[in-house]
Amino acid sequence: MKKILDLGFGRETLRDLCNSGQISSRLLYGMAEISHRGNHIVIECSMSSHSGLIGLLKNNMMSLKKADIIFMSYIYESSLVLICLLKTLGLYKQKKIVGVCHTTVNQGENLLDRIIKKLVFNSFDKVLFHSYVNMEESLSLKTIKRSQAEFLYWGDDLSYVDKVFPIRSHGNFFVSTGRENRDYSLLINAFIDMPLKLEIYTNRFNYDNNYDYLDNYRSKYNNIDIYMVDRSNETTLHLLERVAACRCVLVPLIQSKVNYCLGLTSIVEAMALGKPIISSVNPYSPVDIEKEEIGFVVRNVVEWKSALQYISENPDEAKKMGIRARSLAEKKFNIEKCSQQIESVFSSL
């Protein structure tokens, strides 16, 4: 039985919320399921949020805690420098490192960055990717080796979704709940002269994104409602309620920011709740929406309008898309499959 150090921000809080049934276990990336199965011991370890040298030192010291495997659902390179340096020097060689990479592993912007990246990623035993494209780009850049790389299926906690939302309706409105790099101007323009209802839920600020401009649209159009929300468990649950009641989930993406699996959370939520999806083009997404016949991929306002009209005028077909979406979630994109895949990696090391 191996001891797994689950290293990341807020891990203990997420574990407690998950164990009490307040949130989906998807944010724990399979650690809850692995812990429940009892084949490995999972120790959640919350990284320090202190900035500067103090936080850096604290987080690097955490990586030295007694464990067989370090797991990071988000790879924070600066927090692994010490353990990776020790592994490179022949110390701590028995400690394995596994992480989930959400972007392409680039070569670094300067000499110091390149040195750190090479040190850290050479020390990883397995790097799991959400996107085949990001994985292949990383391999082409030779920042990781083929033996290190593996595609990871990820999705929602279907048992949680079914328990909280046992009945899903098919309302007369479309919903978009994304926070990261969303092109809401384009989406709103598609709805302005259409007799369709749109609900947008997002944060006013999200990292580099500033959605203050949405104030110009609030109360301007009778068919468009815009809500600025905070980050809380209550808000997350409310947004899921709106997704469960909507006709279709919309994922409008800023195309200049599409270099990773942007929008994946919105997509897997929609699939878990059996909803059709209309999304901007994203070649990095692991879900082929049109091939799986669970919705539409669009490129401009004209295509947005066409897809919206089809969903609106063909409710029976829209429901079939939603059924296929849920089926795909059950087969591939769910947290149980994710946990099994990660546990298989742990067992192989």
Regions found by a protein language model. Give the residues of each.
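Conserved acidic donor-binding segment of nucleotide-sugar-dependent glycosyltransferases
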Residues: K291-V302, Y310-D316
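Nucleotide-activated donor-binding/catalytic signature segment of Leloir-type glycosyltransferases, i.e.
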Residues: T202, Y211-V243
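Acidic anion/phosphate-binding donor-loop and adjacent secondary structure
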Residues: L139, E150-G171, S185
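Nucleotide-sugar-dependent
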Residues: N233-L237, E241, V249-V268, S279-V287
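Conserved donor-binding/catalytic core segment of Leloir-type glycosyltransferases
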Residues: P166-R182, L187-Y201
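Membrane-proximal helix-turn-helix segments that form the acceptor-binding/catalytic region
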Residues: M61-K65, G108-V127
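A short alpha->beta transition loop at the rim of the catalytic pocket in nucleotide-sugar-dependent
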Residues: R247, G274-P276
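A short, well-ordered alpha-helix in the C-terminal region of glycosyltransferases
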Residues: Y310, E317-K332, Q341-S344
